[in-house]
Every structure is written in structure tokens, then in C-alpha cells.
């Protein structure tokens, strides 16, 4: 009779452990569903979500290992039910393993909460980046407008240079004694043309690199400043050339 009571007690413990294992599996499935939802949110994040992907992957791997351990525990529980008369010590071993699984499930819950927090933080950072991008796009448009103004000024200088070239050509027929001065003027015009081509090349380079937002804006502003200095130099050179022509 005592043996039957002991067997019944062992069976009740096995059933209790079976229920604990089922509950743990239900919780793992619930965690898996929540994790799937977090994965969908994670896929929408950009840039800063790379670190989050790794941490969620670690949580998934931990959940997979927990499910494998639960399956092993269930198998051992079935074996224990068939051999319930072996020893009470074997039951204690199973109880200890179930407790360890419970502790690991609590750790997984903490990891899941942390993953949710990281996902929310990634969403916030993405919104900040989006706002910053709007601001940079506005600055980029203004920089492009300044570049267009610089190109218009370069066109005006080119027209002035053509006029000077025409004046110099008309002076070539005046007298051979001015040939040395005319050669000097032609050399100055060539230098001015080279500077103008260099300014146009820099403007084209600025347009090709405009996609690099913040760095491009800084580069454009620097090139615009250089273009202004070159334009001032060109005006000074042209004024000097015209003055020399007037003095001939």
C-alpha cells in the first residue's frame, strides 16, 4: 500500500513538472510571438538599427536553445513517468532542471524588454535623422542657388573677356611698334582664360559632389569663396588691361 502511495506521489510530481514544462513552453511561445512583432518593427529601422538586429538575433537564439531544453525536459519527464519507481533522487534532478529553465525564461523576458527599449530608441534616432535630412536639403538648395549665381558671374566675365579680346585684335592692325605689348596682352588673356576654365571646372566638381550633404555644403561654400576671390582677381586684371589699352 505504501508503495502505491509513493508511486501516486511520484506521478503527481511528474504531472506537476509536466504542467510547469507546458507553462514554460507556452511562455516561450508567447515570447516568440512578441519577438516576431519586435522583428517587424526592427526591419523598418535604418542605420542605427544594425546593433539592434544583432541583439534580437541573440534573443532568438536563446529562445531556440530554451525550446530545445524544454523538449529535452519533456522527454526526460516521459521517461521518468515510465520509471517512477527508480528513485526520489532522479525526481529532484528533474525539478532542479525545471527551475533552471524557469530562471532562463526570466532572463529571456528581461532581454526582450531591453530589445523593445532599443527598438524604440532606434525609431527615435531615425526620426531625428529624418528631421536633420530635411534641414540639410534646405541648405543644399541654398548652396545650389549660390553656385548658379557664381556661374552667372563667370559667364559675365567670359563676355567681358571676349570684348577685351576683340579690342586687342583691333589694336593689332594699328602699328607694329606695339607688337611686344600686344603679345603681353595675349599672354594675360590666356592666363585669364585658364583661370576662367579652372573656375568652371571647380563649379562642375561641386555639382557632382552635391549628394554628400553636409560635406558637400561646406565644399560649395569654400569653392564659392574661392570663386569670389578669383572673380575679384579677374576684374582687377581686366581693369588693369583696359587701363593699359587706354594709355596706349
Swiss-Prot record:
Keyword terms, alphabetized: Acetylation, Actin-binding, Calcium, Coiled coil, Cytoplasm, Cytoskeleton, Metal-binding, Muscle protein, Phosphoprotein
GO biological process, one term: actin filament organization
Biased composition range(s): Basic and acidic residues: 33-47
Compartments, record wording: Cytoplasm, Cytoskeleton
Phosphothreonine carried by residues: 216
Annotated segments matching region Disordered: 18-49
Acetylation keyword on record: yes
Sections of the chain in a coiled coil: 2-248
Cross-referenced Pfam families: Tropomyosin
GO molecular function: actin filament binding; identical protein binding; metal ion binding; protein heterodimerization activity; protein homodimerization activity
Residue positions, PTM N6-acetyllysine: 177, 215
Main location: cytoplasm
Residues found modified as Phosphoserine: 6
Location of N-acetylalanine modifications: 2
GO cellular component: actin cytoskeleton; actin filament; cortical cytoskeleton; cytoplasm; podosome; stress fiber
Domain comment (free text): The molecule is in a coiled coil structure that is formed by 2 polypeptide chains. The sequence exhibits a prominent seven-residues periodicity.
Subunit record text: Homodimer. Heterodimer of an alpha (TPM1, TPM3 or TPM4) and a beta (TPM2) chain.
Function: Binds to actin filaments in muscle and non-muscle cells. Plays a central role, in association with the troponin complex, in the calcium dependent regulation of vertebrate striated muscle contraction. Smooth muscle contraction is regulated by interaction with caldesmon. In non-muscle cells is implicated in stabilizing cytoskeleton actin filaments. Binds calcium. Plays a role in platelet biogenesis.
Family: Belongs to the tropomyosin family.
Protein name per the record: Tropomyosin alpha-4 chain
Organism in which the protein naturally occurs: Rattus norvegicus (Rat)
Amino acid at each position: 500500500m505504501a508503495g502505491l502511495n509513493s508511486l501516486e506521489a511520484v506521478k503527481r510530481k511528474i504531472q506537476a513538472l509536466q504542467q510547469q514544462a507546458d507553462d514554460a513552453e507556452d511562455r516561450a511561445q508567447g515570447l516568440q510571438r512578441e519577438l516576431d512583432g519586435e522583428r517587424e518593427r526592427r526591419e523598418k529601422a535604418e542605420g542605427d538599427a544594425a546593433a539592434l538586429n544583432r541583439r534580437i538575433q541573440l534573443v532568438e537564439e536563446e529562445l531556440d536553445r530554451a525550446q530545445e531544453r524544454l523538449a529535452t525536459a519533456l522527454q526526460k519527464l516521459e521517461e521518468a513517468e515510465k520509471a517512477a519507481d527508480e528513485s526520489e533522487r532522479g525526481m529532484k534532478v528533474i525539478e532542479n532542471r525545471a527551475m533552471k529553465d524557469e530562471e532562463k525564461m526570466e532572463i529571456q523576458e528581461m532581454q526582450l524588454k531591453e530589445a523593445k527599449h532599443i527598438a524604440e530608441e532606434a525609431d527615435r534616432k531615425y526620426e531625428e535623422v529624418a528631421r536633420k535630412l530635411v534641414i540639410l536639403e534646405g541648405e543644399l538648395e541654398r548652396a545650389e542657388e549660390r553656385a548658379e549665381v557664381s556661374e552667372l558671374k563667370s559667364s559675365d566675365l567670359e563676355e567681358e573677356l571676349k570684348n577685351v579680346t576683340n579690342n586687342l585684335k583691333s589694336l593689332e592692325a594699328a602699328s607694329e611698334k606695339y607688337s611686344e605689348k600686344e603679345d603681353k596682352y595675349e599672354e594675360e588673356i590666356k592666363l585669364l582664360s585658364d583661370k576662367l576654365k579652372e573656375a568652371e571646372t571647380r563649379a562642375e566638381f561641386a555639382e557632382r559632389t552635391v549628394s554628400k550633404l553636409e560635406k558637400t555644403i561646406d565644399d560649395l561654400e569654400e569653392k564659392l569663396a574661392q570663386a569670389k576671390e578669383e572673380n575679384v582677381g579677374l576684374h582687377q586684371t581686366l581693369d588693369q588691361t583696359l587701363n593699359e589699352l587706354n594709355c596706349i
